[in-house]
Amino acid sequence: MKSKEILGYDIKEISNQTVEQLIEKKKELQGKLNDLQQELLKRKVEARMGTLKNTASIRNLRKDIARILTLLSIINKEIENKKKESKK
């Protein structure tokens, strides 16, 4: 059975990483998220002005943002679980 991937990140791989690695991935994803949000804002302005050529790009950016938010949620839960396990 093939494991699920989101934006090139294997979900099963995430659970096998250390807290430090997860925090590093989280920072990387937050940077990508900020970039995508800025790009989405630019595209929305272009759409308002009528200069946007590819209207589907807004929808695709929103989907990518949702994927990153999903990954961040998974990573945050995994970090919490690993911290709880280390306290035991």
From Swiss-Prot:
A GO cellular component entry from the record: ribonucleoprotein complex
GO BP term, pick one: translation
Record-linked Pfam families: Ribosomal_L29
Keyword annotations of the record: Ribonucleoprotein, Ribosomal protein
InterPro entries reported for this sequence: Ribosomal_uL29, Ribosomal_uL29_CS, Ribosomal_uL29_sf
GO molecular function: structural constituent of ribosome
NCBIfam families from the UniProt entry: L29
Family of the protein in this entry: Belongs to the universal ribosomal protein uL29 family.
Protein name per its UniProtKB record: Large ribosomal subunit protein uL29
